UniProtKB/Swiss-Prot annotation:
UniProt-recorded name of the protein: Adenylosuccinate synthetase 2
Family, as annotated: Belongs to the adenylosuccinate synthetase family.
Lineage of producing organism: Eukaryota, Discoba, Euglenozoa, Kinetoplastea, Metakinetoplastina
Species assigned in the record: Trypanosoma cruzi (strain CL Brener)
GO terms under cellular component: cytoplasm
Keyword rRNA processing assigned: no
Subunit structure: Homodimer.
Record-listed Mg(2+) binding positions: 88, 117
Cofactor binding summary note: Binds 1 Mg(2+) ion per subunit.
């Protein structure tokens, strides 16, 4: 870690991560005094030599899926498609490409739950939104499984996912099999709702159900299909957590009902009707037993059940190839201590997939294809995100649940905003350019906005970066090489970058190649994993990523890349085989240089086939 010579060297009080909280909320639409003070410090940070790297840029050429992806698949028995950032990376396209390989016949989700989500299209162009169902359901001749370490709300699964398959006449009964999953009940979702800040959770009950799971309470799918007395007993034991929470918080059923109505008040159904009915039920355990009897056990449309882990091992022993479809991502994994307070509750790294798939990794070769998204790399929820345009909890703190909560015409002129940001807020023409952006103001008919706020709102609008169902805005930012380097070191080298055709709309693009730490206090030192972080410290790609307590105060050092507006790569505008623009080559070269990844493909459109494979 480089030390800035000009920083205040006086040793101040040392704080541990447990004592350090996220920056206090003082968020405004316009640039405030605190933001100007941060910039006044950061603008004097000396440039790092890495801003001039790489010295030369590679030229990349297009190749076929058979020449790039298929050899990787054919060398291995287990292929994992995993998120490389904070989820929502556009993994579905790569998942479909792997699933379409003739030798890949077994496709599985093996952990996490319906808080994951992906949009996929079948050969007829029909759109499907899946949360827990594997994408291979739309490929003929593939068997799809939901493994026992997944968590499932079977009511939601039937209403939102299986219903789509039934209406589209997809023969899922022959293709979809469910393991002995842990059951997400209405009270898990209510605990999630009552304990979460706006825009900070998917409200799918993930933390509460995993708490039930690790404390060996709760129920699994097999309990619904067996002795009802055991089912009742286990539900009565587990539901005590919910009743205890209400007692501690002094909440009644009427209070909870009002909270549900408020959450659904803007027309987006975040709390489904059966959860509301649970709140209203006098005997809540009996309500659940009847609910599961009527809509799961006695439902002829419920998919077949099986021992998924056994089926997976049997498939491998027969020489079949298995694809594990990763939910969320590396940095959203609860098994990664750097962000563990703001992650999901399952291990969603590639190693987490491997562990929950329950096969002998000594016998079968595995490979990981990581997926990142750029431009407009995004994260939902709360937590640190050094490369974002605004603080990760900005929308949450402002009470913004959906884009509809913003002024109707606020920051809709994406082109003007990105032009101001990349051509005026940065100063690459100066000798002392250090990769820090100036907090300029953007003005439209609705008011004046800090340029970071304008970029965050405009990116969410322009790129559709909001939840497919919740419409919750994602917080966008730069491609982050500091975080991606660790992902590559742990589960690389293969990387697919989705949505790169978005770059068609930019004058320039930014890539985070390092962070500078600044907490706004002159002498405070933060001690994480035995290292002291002081104002002005630089954290580069390849160095240890600090914990979240420090990451809240890390600011991106941004390398600017030339755009390619005049030579768009979108599938609707580009002819297959056309040379890739210089700006694209600059972008890919920079990412490979700083992360050591091997980029195998880039996305260039919404359709499943809109992928450009990169000649290796």
């Amino acid at each position: 870690m480089d030390k800035q010579a000009e920083r205040d060297q006086s040793a101040g009080p040392v704080k541990t991560p447990q004592e350090t909280q996220p920056p206090a909320h003082n968020y405004t639409y316009h640039t405030n005094a605190a933001q100007r003070a941060v910039y006044d410090y950061l603008k004097n940070v000396k440039p790092i030599p890495e801003l001039a790297e790489p010295k030369t840029y590679k030229t990349y050429e297009e190749a076929s899926v058979e020449a790039v992806l298929y050899p990787i698949i054919e060398k291995h028995q287990v292929i994992m498609v995993a998120g490389a950032f904070f989820g929502d990376e556009g993994k579905g396209k790569t998942v479909n490409a792997v699933a379409n390989h003739p030798g890949c016949t077994f496709i599985a989700r093996v952990n996490s739950g319906e808080n994951a989500g992906h949009t996929v299209y079948d050969d007829a162009g029909r759109k499907f939104v899946f949360n827990l169902a594997p994408s291979g359901l739309l490929s003929k001749g593939k068997r799809n499984y939901v493994g026992p370490e997944c968590v499932m709300d079977p009511i939601s699964f039937m209403e939102n996912e299986v219903k789509q398959l039934i209406e589209a006449n997809v023969p899922y009964k022959e293709q979809l099999f469910i393991g002995n999953v842990s059951i997400v009940t209405p009270y898990h979702k209510l605990l999630d709702l009552l304990a979460s800040a706006p825009n900070s959770s998917t409200l799918k009950g993930m933390a509460p159900i995993h708490a039930s799971k690790v404390t060996k309470r709760g129920i699994r799918l097999d309990h619904i299909f067996n002795d009802q007395s055991v089912l009742r007993s286990r539900l009565r034991k587990d539901i005590d957590t919910y009743f205890g929470f209400l007692k501690v918080k002094g909440l009644s059923d009427a209070d909870v009902l009002r909270r549900c109505e408020k959450e659904n008040g803007d027309g987006v159904v975040r709390v489904p009707p059966y959860v509301v009915e649970f709140v209203q039920a006098e005997d809540k355990v009996e309500y659940l037993v009847k609910l599961y009897m009527d809509r799961v056990r006695n439902n002829k449309n419920f998919p077949a059940r099986c021992d998924v882990a056994h089926e997976l091992r049997s498939a491998l022993s027969r020489g079949e190839k298995v694809m594990l479809e990763g939910p969320q991502s590396y940095w959203l994994s609860n098994a990664r201590e750097k962000f563990w307070e703001s992650t999901t509750s399952a291990d969603t790294t590639a190693s987490g997939l491997l562990a929950t798939a329950q096969y002998n990794f000594q016998l079968y070769s595995s490979v990981v294809i990581n997926v990142h998204k750029a431009p407009g790399s995004s994260r939902v929820g709360v937590g640190a995100n050094p490369s974002s345009f605004v603080a990760q909890d900005y929308f949450s703190a402002k009470g913004v649940k959906t884009l509809r909560d913003l002024p109707e015409n606020m920051c809709v002129d994406f082109d003007s905003i990105q032009k101001l940001f990349f051509t005026k807020a940065f100063h690459p023409e100066t000798k002392e350019y250090n990769g820090i952006w100036e907090p300029l103001e953007f003005e439209d008919s609705t008011g004046k906005y800090n340029i970071g706020v304008a970029m965050a709102v405009a990116s969410s609008r322009h790129h559709g970066e909001c939840g497919a169902v919740t419409k919750k805005p994602r917080v966008c930012g730069f491609f982050d090489c500091v975080l991606q380097y660790e992902v590559n070191a742990v589960q690389g080298p293969y990387l697919s970058i989705s949505a790169l055709d978005r770059g068609d709309d930019y004058d320039k693009l930014g890539i985070t190649i390092a962070y500078v730490y600044y907490n706004g206090k002159n002498n405070e030192v933060l001690n994480i994993n035995g290292r002291e972080y002081k104002n002005g410290d630089i954290i580069k790609a390849g160095e240890a990523v600090p914990g979240e307590a420090a990451l809240y105060y890390c600011h991106p050092i941004v390398k600017l890349i030339n755009g390619w507006k005049q030579t768009p790569i979108a599938a609707s505008k580009r002819k297959p085989g056309d040379p890739l623009p210089r700006g694209v080559c600059e972008f890919l070269s920079t990412v490979e240089y700083f992360t050591k990844a091997k980029i195998i493909s880039i996305g260039n459109g919404p359709r499943g086939k809109d992928i450009i494979y990169i000649k290796q």
